[in-house]
Amino acid sequence: MSRRGDRPRTPAQPRKKARVDQPRSARTRRTRVSEAEAGLRSSSFVFRHRTGNLAILAVLVIAAVQLFMLQVPRAAGLRAEAASQLKVTDITPAIRGSIIDRNNDKLAFTIEARALTFQPTRVRKQLDEAWRKAQEAGSSTSDDVPNPDERLNEIAKEIAARLNNTPDAKTVLKKLKSNETFVYLARAVDPAIANAITDKFPEVGSERQDLRQYPGGSLAANIVGGIDWDGHGLLGLEDSLDAVLAGTDGSVTYDRGSDGVVIPGSYRNRHDAVDGSTVQLTIDDDIQYHVQQQVQMAKDASGAKNVSAVVLDAKTGEVLAMSNDNTFDPSQDIGRQADRQMGNPSVSSPFEPGSVNKIVTAAAAIENGLTNPDEVLQVPGSIHMGGVTVRDAWNHGVMPYTTTGVFGKSSNVGTLMLAQRVGPERFYEMLRKFGLGQRTNVGLPGESSGLLPPIDQWSGSSFSNLPIGQGLSMTLLQMAAMYQTVANDGVRVPPRIIKSTIAPDGTVTEEERPEGIRVISPETARTLRSMFRSVVQRDPMGVQQGTGPQAAVEGYQIAGKTGTAQQINPACGCYYDDVYWITFAGIAPADDPRYVIGIMMDAPQRAADGSPGSSAAPLFHEIASWLLQRHNVPLSPDPGPPLTLQAT
């Protein structure tokens, strides 16, 4: 039985320590601090987490935008850029057409040549790198790799030796050691020599650079012109006909891998080169050579500033020769020939012709029936006309000159007397018919039209100057064309110098022949040719002698006219008293015209042959006699009756 108060025993519980109660306020503060610290730690973690996420998101957005830009808007451009890094276009230069004379002799043609090239900075870097690696690898390897300096010296010596020391080794070496990215070591190199050099020295490059040849040197250079180093026309016909001569380059495009190997099947856009056409001229290189020689000799003998001469075919107006002194040589460096004549004065430099122009007055008077060759005019020593007094070149009283004699003796007064009969309007019309004040359109660059004042701009003195060849200007070609009209029975055929164009396939296209222009009747032309024989007529007594007997050619009838015109002094706008243009224009033979020759001398001190005076007639004689003999022109069957210049 149990006792009261007895209870079941439980395991013993550890005794709790006695708690010491603290004040309530202290406990509260401690609790709040702990909670605050926990809150701060939690907020910092959240901030860092969010910031990190935002940064990652921003990077992903930027990457996505860049990827989008690469794949969509810039994709085409990038593909094109990548393709261009692989794409290569090779150019095949067209061969420039030749320029030939009327007999197919070449005045200019092209031969294949090479230019030796080098990339100094790139090649030297490669040589230095190869040498360094060889040295590091050991002597056995370095024996197979050239020393960079020695290699460059070998290249320079090889090029100089094969090119006859032009350029020399020192010059080549200087280019090899330059800091340029690209240089030309030599130009105009024979392809075989260029190949030998590049085979031995792969560091040297070779590019095609065709060479223009001018076998005659300065022969006809004033007509043919020249080209620059890039093969483009620079002067003369080489320039004005550049599009015809140059042709069209060929090309082919292909892709090349990073290793430089052509990617198979990538060839495209293939265009074959079309070579330039050949241009045939009307000139005869033999005549051109002779005339050019004679012109230079006349310049040296006379002390003139310049001398020019033109030879035309009397019937067709074709230019057979056109020469001036001191002509440049297109086969040499044009840039070093500043003292040479680069232009073509025969078409580009007009001058006052002087008495050569009197043939217009004669033509107008004869054509209009206002005189005849044998009419005797009482010619005084001077004439007052248009407010000015004009005198003859020599003092004389009233002289009984025939119309023939007026022109044979070149009387200014007699010419103006006849011009008064013609009148200003008919005289001006005749000047225009003869082509003055108008370009001939011969086909040469830089042609001048000369100066012919319109009749409504004439001053009071114009009509006293123009009939005697002052107050207007013309080119030498225009002057010769006037006399071609008389030689061709009154029909002016505008001169031309381009005969035909020959395509690469051999197709010949003849240059269109200019249409003839009737200026005077055949009867007037024949009368003028007979009258103007008086100019070259000799007379031991001097009474019936003309002003240019030195122009005569034994056995042939020659018609022509001398000219002397005062030059203008730019300082005062007035005429010099002692500086002249000296001219001569003539027809050979006069009875059956074959050639028309025009000559201009600028301020000569002596005659063309060095004799006293200032006549161009001796130069005409030299050219005309050579032409007639060279082409076996038959002698004139009738030397013609003596002409009366002065009535007795």
Swiss-Prot record:
The chain crosses the membrane at residues 52-72. One of its GO terms (molecular function) is penicillin binding. It is found in: Cell membrane. GO terms for biological process: cell wall organization. The keyword Transmembrane helix applies. GO terms for cellular component: plasma membrane. Residues 1-35 are annotated as: Disordered. Its main location: membrane. The active site is at S355 (acyl-ester intermediate). It is a single-pass membrane protein. Keywords: Cell membrane, Membrane, Transmembrane, Transmembrane helix. Pfam families: PBP_dimer, Transpeptidase. PANTHER family: PEPTIDOGLYCAN D,D-TRANSPEPTIDASE (PTHR30627), PEPTIDOGLYCAN D,D-TRANSPEPTIDASE FTSI (PTHR30627:SF1). Interacts with Wag31. Belongs to the transpeptidase family. This is Penicillin-binding protein PbpB. It comes from Mycolicibacterium smegmatis (strain ATCC 700084 / mc(2)155). The gene is pbpB.
